[in-house]
Amino acid sequence: MEQTGYREGILFLDEINCVSETLAPVMLQLLQFKKFGTHKVPEGWIIVAAGNPPELNHAVREMDMASLDRVRTLNIEADVTVWKQYAASRGVHPAILSYLEMKPETFYRVVEERKKKEFVTARGWEDLSTVLKEYEHQGLDINRYFMEEFIRSPEVAADFDAYYRMDRTCMGGYRISELFAE
């Protein structure tokens, strides 16, 4: 803040509900008085914190009543339509966008069975896009196992891999992803 000269902004604290028991009083002080030890958050700055629900992160600690009384909770759900707008603006791979257009139910899922967790997230799709484009650029092998590094559901990864292979095969001069492009 001092280096940039910004007089207002957002101080973002991620995974606030994973703070250790020893740091909890410091976080309470930060939330209540906008102070971290001897450092004060300047006027014009707000504190925004985020955390995942316990079912998605086993390191989550339930916040005590004093802390909860100082925060407002917004529950945010994954929305494929909103994400696709973001993804298009970020240049996410067209095969991913067209696949999700056809199969929006595969955008986000978390399944835990017999201590095995399978998940598909927005971060996974975006990371896949970044690496997929680079692999294509370098002519490297892309297969289902590659997809599973980012799409942590074997079923969805295999389905997307099949779609991707079909997309890479020109159909009448057009790729499937180009037919569904907006």
Regions found by a protein language model. Give the residues of each.
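C-terminal regulatory/interaction module of P-loop NTP-utilizing enzymes
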Residues: M1-P25, L30-E182
